[in-house]
From Swiss-Prot:
GO biological process: translation
Gene: rplV
A GO CC term assigned to this protein in UniProt: cytosolic large ribosomal subunit
Function, in words: This protein binds specifically to 23S rRNA; its binding is stimulated by other ribosomal proteins, e.g. L4, L17, and L20. It is important during the early stages of 50S assembly. It makes multiple contacts with different domains of the 23S rRNA in the assembled 50S subunit and ribosome. The globular domain of the protein is located near the polypeptide exit tunnel on the outside of the subunit, while an extended beta-hairpin is found that lines the wall of the exit tunnel in the center of the 70S ribosome.
Cross-referenced NCBIfam families: rplV_bact
Descriptive protein name: Large ribosomal subunit protein uL22
Similarity section: Belongs to the universal ribosomal protein uL22 family.
HAMAP family: Ribosomal_uL22_B
Coiled coil location: none
Protein source organism: Nitratidesulfovibrio vulgaris (strain ATCC 29579 / DSM 644 / CCUG 34227 / NCIMB 8303 / VKM B-1760 / Hildenborough) (Desulfovibrio vulgaris)
Stored Pfam families: Ribosomal_L22
Assembly and oligomerization: Part of the 50S ribosomal subunit.
Amino acid sequence: MESRATAKFMRVSPRKTRLVARNIDGLPVEDAMNLLRFTPNKPAGVLYDVLRSALANAQQMPGVDVDAMVVKQVVVNEGPSWKRFLPRAQGRATRIKKRTSHITVILAEGQE
């Protein structure tokens, strides 16, 4: 059985989030949660919340062994960017793109 959770429009850069997501792909859920809990950056906290949500979704399914769940796949897609301007010298302005992410975590029952 598979369980999934999605968080959309999260205010974290997709590029930085993918760096953290690669670390938990294929790990048992308990190990992935420990890794994310002690990773000191913002994407780790967001991924931790999505992973907890996927685990809670798995607990709602009958006949699923939550202790044997493994992170099957983590997908981080780019969401819309917020466009902002930063004032610069001599009346100029520079564009800033505040990027957002769509994060999907898929859990599956597997071998540890």
